[in-house]
């Protein structure tokens, strides 16, 4: 293909699919898997929504794009308007570049998408960010908007690059506050949810309670690492959960209420099903225009969700598999082959370079692209394009979390995962309010003994229960990995670390 159309679909808070129960049907996702190439060891670079999305759309690591916080308020970090995004790269190449759905890289309801290189955006981005019921409410109109755009422009003469940002399965964050049975049990929560969702100015206005679907019973067993008490893990894992639940106490699930935790997993499945219906609407539009012969489709997520693994919920300042390992499917006519799979390590930072290459961009002239090309994996799914993936996170999120070492940097080589935790104080919280203290203590250049450390052997310990960094007999190994990571950071991150 010369200058193919490119359809880029990003879901929110969706982990890699090997946890899904046997017998579950997700026909739209399965269609992509059956017709293209699945990457099973694909990782996000960072866990918060906005930093992860900044990496997707710039091809840069967090140290370069500097979006360290969710871009929810003007005082939080945002993607600079002069950032070189995929929209700008492909527009310069003669592409029509459009965007539908969640953006979350500017702290306002109507982001200046033209400044980021994208046209035809509609909606209220603050409603897409992920308040209770947002995915259930908005994914269908987002998908319909995208499908209408495809039908209107899919056969235009100029090539196009359309990005669609779906919200679900992000709604898992709010379980059980958005469940009608919970409203009946806890009627005082109704007022909170009503206030959360009653001021929408885009979408329907009659969705209280926000979720009315029945939940099928899929799970009888909790995750294998559910009982991890986290006392051998970096302090921030417990501190973040305590901070989150201190702000939202109605999200606290009784650790002994097994059925509630299982229902959470069932809800996560249901949100995948609803998201898949929205994805199907977009694929149907591609069928309607007969657009598959000259269109590349890429589906991924920004990050995953713990959903009870390690006794944790949501995505936080940790680098566990459930949060960091995410889906990636590609269907590229004449490039990928049906029902193929690659188990090679890939990173979200690789996607921008790969998409730009698909569009014919001379990536050698774009030094800001820090990822690797994934093209060798199209020919040989066993090829090795990188020796490791890098993780980074520098946000305390909730009051109190800034008092421990909340920032982290890490690497995973396919077997061993090592992460260093540093940083006390500095930054802004989830509402854009400044934490006490202007400077981060024990910062990026802190000495080895001023860190919390974490190391796992995933071949021997796939559930990441045994923190080898606490084994005094392995102290030399941990120190060596710390030095290796610091060396890589100085080579890869031009802005320091």
Regions found by a protein language model. Give the residues of each.
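Catalytic-site neighborhoods of secreted/periplasmic enzymes
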Residues: 55, 60-160, 167-193
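Active-site-proximal N-terminal segment of extracellular/periplasmic enzymes that hydrolyze or transfer
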Residues: 1-40, 46-47, 463-475
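Polar, surface-exposed loop/tail segments
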Residues: 26-27, 56, 102, 143, ...
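Active-site-proximal cap/lid insertion segments
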Residues: 13-22, 155, 166-294, 298-345, ...
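Active-site rim elements
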Residues: 18-19, 43, 72-77, 130-136, ...
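C-terminal, low-complexity/hydrophilic appendages and adjacent surface loops
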Residues: 105, 179-180, 320-322, 395-469
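Short, solvent-exposed turn/loop segments enriched in Gly/Ser/Thr/Pro and often Arg
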Residues: 18-25, 38-60, 99-110, 165-170, ...
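Short catalytic/ligand-binding loop motif for oxyanion handling, primarily in non-cytosolic enzymes
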Residues: 15-19, 48-53, 64-67, 99, ...
């Amino acid at each position: 293909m010369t200058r193919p159309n490119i359809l880029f679909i990003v879901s929110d808070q969706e982990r890699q699919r090997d946890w899904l129960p046997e017998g579950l049907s997700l026909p739209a996702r399965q269609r992509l898997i059956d017709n293209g190439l699945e990457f099973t060891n694909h990782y996000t670079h960072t866990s918060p929504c906005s930093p992860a999305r900044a990496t997707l759309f710039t091809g840069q690591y967090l140290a370069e794009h500097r979006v360290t916080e969710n871009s929810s308020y003007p005082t939080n970090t945002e993607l600079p308007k002069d950032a070189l995004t995929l929209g700008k790269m492909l527009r310069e190449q003669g592409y029509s570049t459009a965007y539908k759905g969640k953006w979350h890289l500017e702290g306002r309801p109507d982001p200046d998408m033209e400044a980021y290189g994208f046209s035809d955006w509609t909606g209220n981005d603050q409603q897409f960010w992920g308040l209770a019921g947002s995915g259930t409410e908005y994914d269908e109109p987002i998908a319909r908007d995208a499908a209408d755009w495809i039908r209107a422009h899919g056969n235009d003469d100029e090539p196009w690059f359309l990005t669609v940002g779906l919200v679900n399965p992000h709604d898992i964050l709010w379980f059980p506050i958005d469940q009608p049975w919970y409203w009946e049990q806890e009627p005082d929560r109704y007022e909170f949810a009503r206030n959360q969702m009653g001021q929408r100015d885009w979408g329907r206005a009659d969705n209280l309670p926000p979720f009315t679907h029945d939940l099928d019973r899929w799970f009888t067993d909790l995750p294998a690492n559910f009982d991890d008490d986290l006392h051998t893990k970096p302090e921030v894992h417990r501190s973040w959960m305590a901070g989150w639940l201190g702000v939202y106490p109605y999200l606290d699930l009784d650790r002994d209420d097994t059925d509630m935790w299982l229902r959470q997993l069932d809800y996560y499945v249901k949100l995948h099903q609803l998201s898949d219906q929205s994805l199907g609407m977009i694929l149907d539009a591609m069928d309607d225009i007969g657009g598959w012969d000259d269109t590349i489709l890429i589906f991924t997520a920004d990050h995953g969700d713990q959903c009870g693994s390690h006794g944790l919920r949501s995505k936080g300042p940790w680098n566990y598999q459930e949060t960091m390992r995410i889906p990636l499917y590609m269907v590229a006519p004449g490039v990928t082959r049906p029902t193929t799979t690659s188990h090679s390590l890939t990173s979200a930072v690789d996607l921008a370079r790969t998409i730009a290459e698909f569009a014919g961009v001379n990536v050698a002239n774009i030094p800001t692209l820090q990822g690797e090309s994934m093209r060798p994996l199209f020919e040989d799914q066993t090829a090795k394009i990188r020796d490791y993936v890098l993780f980074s996170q520098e946000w305390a999120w909730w009051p109190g979390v800034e008092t421990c070492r909340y920032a982290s940097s890490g690497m995973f080589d396919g077997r061993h995962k090592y992460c260093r935790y540093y940083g006390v104080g500095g930054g802004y919280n989830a509402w854009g309010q400044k934490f006490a203290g202007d400077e981060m203590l024990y910062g990026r250049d802190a000495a080895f003994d001023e860190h919390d450390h974490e190391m796992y052997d995933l071949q021997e310990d796939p559930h990441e229960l045994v923190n080898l960094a606490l084994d005094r007999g392995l102290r030399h190994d941990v120190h060596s990995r710390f030095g290796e990571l610091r060396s890589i950071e100085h080579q890869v991150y031009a802005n320091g670390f």
